[in-house]
Amino acid sequence: MTEKLKQGIDQLGLKVAETIQQSMLAFLAFLQKWNQAYNLTAITEIKSMITHHLLDSLSILPYLKGDKILDVGSGAGFPGIPLAFACPEKKFTLIDSKAKKTAFLLQAASRFKITNVTIIQERVGSYQPGFYFDTITCRALGSVREIMEQTNHLLRSGGQWLIMKGTYPEKELRGTDASAIVHVLNVPGLKAERHLVEVKNNKG
């Protein structure tokens, strides 16, 4: 499994220390254990988790900007946890409304000493941190328009949304911000289509 992750990271053109890669794999094992009781993810095998969770999350790393990142609907921690592992200099806030998921994330952050993450259990529309984020990430949660509307109060002017999607979200992009750019994500070992919708916040 170590080699599978290493090769995938190399194919993505990223540089992640081997110690960090080992921590990522340990996190997956921890998730697998919790998943038996709490059903946090439909993907149960470590091999598939590497592709569908770790490498998929890391594929958006080159597009990450700023130091304050909000991961919305973080669930079992994707993409937030892998990105936090890979970018210890950035501050990540992972928000989810479900208690069992934030309980897992709190335990994982403590166990693996991920000191650059803050875990919040709350609906994102009600979240008021008292500051703005530079980037808001989201995977598999609502339409592009819905995500932007629910989180607009949290993103600084000039900041960006990075919204992960499967197939090209043509219908979702109709009527959204004209500044939207769609990137094709080539995730090593993943046959399914993956796209990243990047939208800049142009509010004054």
UniProtKB/Swiss-Prot annotation:
Binding locations of S-adenosyl-L-methionine: G73, F78, R139
Organism this protein belongs to: Coxiella burnetii (strain CbuG_Q212) (Coxiella burnetii (strain Q212))
Disulfide bond keyword on record: no
Gene this protein is translated from: rsmG
Catalytic activity reported: guanosine(527) in 16S rRNA + S-adenosyl-L-methionine = N(7)-methylguanosine(527) in 16S rRNA + S-adenosyl-L-homocysteine
Keyword terms: Cytoplasm, Methyltransferase, rRNA processing, S-adenosyl-L-methionine, Transferase
The keyword Cytoplasm appears for this protein: yes
Family: Belongs to the methyltransferase superfamily. RNA methyltransferase RsmG family.
Gene3D superfamilies xref list: Vaccinia Virus protein VP39
Signal peptide (from-to): none
InterPro entries assigned to the protein according to its UniProt record, in alphabetical order: rRNA_ssu_MeTfrase_G, SAM-dependent_MTases_sf
Role according to the record: Specifically methylates the N7 position of guanine in position 527 of 16S rRNA.
Disulfide cross-links: none
Cellular component aspect of the GO annotation: cytosol
Enzyme Commission code(s) on record: 2.1.1.170
UniProt protein name: Ribosomal RNA small subunit methyltransferase G
Major location (coarse): cytoplasm
Superkingdom, taxonomy of origin: Bacteria
Enzyme class: transferase
GO MF terms held by the record: rRNA (guanine-N7-)-methyltransferase activity
